[in-house]
Amino acid sequence: MPIKKFDWSTLTRLEIYDYLQLLQKNIVNKRLTADAHYKILGNHIRKIAPIRVERKINYNVGRNNVIVGGQYNSEWDEENKKAITIFLYYCPFDKHLKMPAENFVFTSKNISDTILHEIIHMRQYRRRNFEYTKDYKSKEEQDHKRKEQSYLGCKDEIDAFSFNIACELYDRFGNRHKSIAKYLECKRPKKHCIYKYYLNTFNNDHNHPVMLQLKKKIKMYLPLAEMGKPFKNNNWIWY
């Protein structure tokens, strides 16, 4: 079923997060079945924008927690169907869960960041008339490492993750850009974050071409991270 026109540029990180936090009284420290938890959270997300929400099981999810994933489907978008899907991953052993406040805050931030990440992909594909882009050609011998590098080194992912990282850094450092620049050159960041994951994937090589592109993009996105959205206008994302 075709979707109505929607201006994706109106969504900001803080507004999505605040909207999700309206569920605190329904979710935080409430003993809910996994089905009930998903229904409450999923229905709320669907009211934000024309977004699909799916529940999945993942054995890496801790008890009383939810991991968030996302996907943009360019073929659905070209057919004017809902093209962004948010995946909510639950622990298979949680028949019931009682999510503490800090877990729900973390989940809400992840949902907000994932939605904006997928909107960036939407804009990328629309502006180039839905043409696919190539993955990065990794030279790693290990299959798992090669796949990770191929994915994270893709120009589309560098662009989208750069905004996510800029938001993480803004949360941590505010507008102290010198501190951010220093952090980006840190050999081994201590705090677990997307930037650290990139560094690990590319063998902690700050001069790797992918890392150089990533750092350049992060710095470009810092002013937009303060605004809470990755665009200054609604070109390609108002329909």
Walk through the language-model features, giving the residues of each:
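Compositionally biased low-complexity segments enriched in polar/charged residues
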Residues: 11-12, 27-31, 51, 105, ...
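Zn2+-dependent metallopeptidase catalytic core
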Residues: 23-49
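Active-site scaffold of zinc-dependent metalloenzymes
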Residues: 62-109, 119-126
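Amphipathic alpha-helical recognition patches that constitute DNA-binding helices
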Residues: 106, 110-111, 155, 159
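Post-HEXXH active-site segment of zinc metalloproteases
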Residues: 109, 125-153
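Catalytic Zn2+-binding segment of zinc metalloproteases
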Residues: 118-134, 159, 166
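Long, well-structured alpha-helical subdomains associated
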Residues: 144-157, 162-239
